[in-house]
Curated annotation (Swiss-Prot):
Subunit structure, interactors included: Monomer.
Localization: Cytoplasm
Cofactor(s) the record lists: Zn(2+)
Name under which the protein is recorded: Glutamate--tRNA ligase
Length: 480
């Protein structure tokens, strides 16, 4: 049987991996980790990475899901050398191989009705036998190929399938446990397990990194590969990701979609760093640059045990990257969140300044955008608890005094603003907090912000003075 090689593959590449999601939903964190491990292994070995969309499930696959998967891969910055390839565009190739297999006696047409198969299964269950096809049609030549039928792979009946999993070690499955797998449906469409085999062959895949839920497919796929004379890739089945309660990760544990983490304010570097450590390690190191991941990653260091997703750890990593990455880079991601929250940033400080001001305070970019709205827009009301706590006593007098000094400043900068607040406190013979806290509530609407000099510079003189007067009027109205 001949290899179909339309992909312009470099024959000198020794390692070629793939990520092959089904477009029936978003890119979830488990799939993203599998893609990351596959990508890292290729990069570590100077190999190539293939993106393949396994869209043979015509009822459940959608263009929207495909777009979401590609968007997630691009956001995570996991570029591919080949693809995306779509299985639905390769049906002719799959059917060509199936027809050749029938000719060579490696597969056969099965005309059994649904009723016959159900009766067979019922009988086997009654006899406490393993449900499997009885090869009724293997030697039945009384039907025309034009009659409705499926095509089954003629699986070996003796011996075992043995493979050395790069994560789990040697795995052996007796062929007596395997059925004659359907490789083409009645409607003429090839099945998932068969398409995967032909694709891995044609695309020169040397290493298959995928979830442990695919282990049962592997012996079936290996037998087909052997039958058609194709090389057998190395398989690596990675463990599942659980929630912190030990149950399989699902929506009830929080976000599971990669793009939901983007929406929630996480940087791709944080999610990548978190996912790589979720089942793999290099000593006690927690924080890895992309280059370090590529240099250190090996499949035999991937854990066999399930990993527990810990959102607090992810938040810690996210805050680290918000602090440590260049403000210009973080600002590009922050800009998306301002747009998402309908905050117009055209009249206010540079976003790089926002990042510098709030990097130590915010765990997510979503929080950074929402908590800095006052730099760009007017707020409607003062935070009730903050106003009750700080708009009392001599707060109005302190605000009037500091407004007077701020108005008189010839230069609006950190030093001059700090001096104005300090002088106001000295003249009123009160602590800095008695001036600073009412001022903070007055100009931000809340009791939390960066230092007052930084905050006032960011808001701008005109807005600051208007807001202070608004707060004074509010206090007088409350006391009237």
């Amino acid at each position: 049987m001949k290899l179909d090689a339309p992909f312009n593959l470099d024959p000198n590449v020794k390692v070629r991996t793939r990520f092959a999601p089904s477009p029936t939903g978003y890119l979830h964190v488990g799939g993203a980790r599998t893609a990351l491990y596959s990508w890292l292994y290729a990069k570590h070995n100077n190999g190539e990475f293939v993106l393949r969309i396994e869209d043979t499930d015509l009822e459940r696959s959608t263009p929207e899901a495909t777009a979401a998967i590609i968007e997630g891969m691009e956001w995570l910055n996991l570029p591919w050398e080949h693809g995306p390839y779509y299985q639905t565009k390769r049906f002719d190739r799959y059917n060509q191989v199936i027809d050749e297999m029938i000719e060579q006696g490696l597969a056969y047409r099965c005309y059994c009705t649904k009723e016959h198969l159900e009766e067979l299964r019922h009988t086997q269950e009654q006899n406490k036998e393993k449900p499997r096809y009885d090869r009724h049609c293997l030697h039945d030549h009384n039907h025309s190929p034009d009659e409705p039928h499926v095509v089954r792979f003629k699986n070996p009946t003796e011996g075992s399938v043995v493979f050395d999993d790069a994560v789990r070690g040697r795995i052996e499955i007796s062929n007596s446990e395997l059925d004659d797998l359907i490789i083409r449906r009645t409607d003429g469409s090839p099945t998932y397990n068969f398409c995967v085999v032909v694709d891995d062959w044609d695309m020169g895949i040397t290493h298959v990194v995928r979830g442990e839920d695919h282990i049962n497919n592997t012996p079936r796929q290996i037998n087909i590969l052997k039958a058609i004379g194709a090389p057998i890739p190395t398989y690596a089945h990675v463990s599942m990701i659980n929630g912190d309660d030990g149950q399989k990760l699902s929506k009830r544990h929080g976000a599971v979609s990669v793009m939901q983490y983007r929406d929630d304010g996480y940087l791709p570097e944080a999610l990548i760093n978190y996912l790589v450590r979720l089942g793999w390690g290099h000593g006690d190191q927690e924080i890895f640059s992309r280059e370090e991941m590529i240099n250190y990653f090996e499949l035999d260091h991937v854990s066999k045990s399930a990993s527990a997703f810990n959102t607090e750890k992810l938040q810690w990593l996210n805050q680290h990257y918000i602090r440590e990455l260049p403000p210009e880079y973080v600002a590009k991601h922050l800009e998306w969140h301002y747009k998402d929250q309908s905050i117009d940033t055209s009249n206010g400080p540079a976003l790089t300044d926002i990042v510098s001001m709030l990097a130590e305070r915010c765990k997510t970019l979503k929080e950074m955008a929402s908590s800095s709205r006052y730099f760009f827009e007017e707020f409607e009301t003062f935070d009730e608890a903050a106003a009750k706590k700080h708009f009392k006593g001599n707060a109005a007098e302190a605000l009037a005094k500091v407004k007077e000094k701020l108005t008189a400043l010839s230069s609006w900068n950190l030093h001059s603003i700090h001096e104005a607040i300090e002088q106001t406190a000295a003249e009123l013979e009160v602590g800095m907090g008695k001036v600073g806290m009412p001022l903070r509530v007055a100009v931000t609407g809340s009791g939390q912000s960066p230092s007052m000099d930084v905050t006032l510079v960011g808001i701008g003189r005109d807005r600051v003075l208007v807001r202070i007067q608004r707060a004074i009027d509010f206090i007088h109205a409350q006391n009237a």
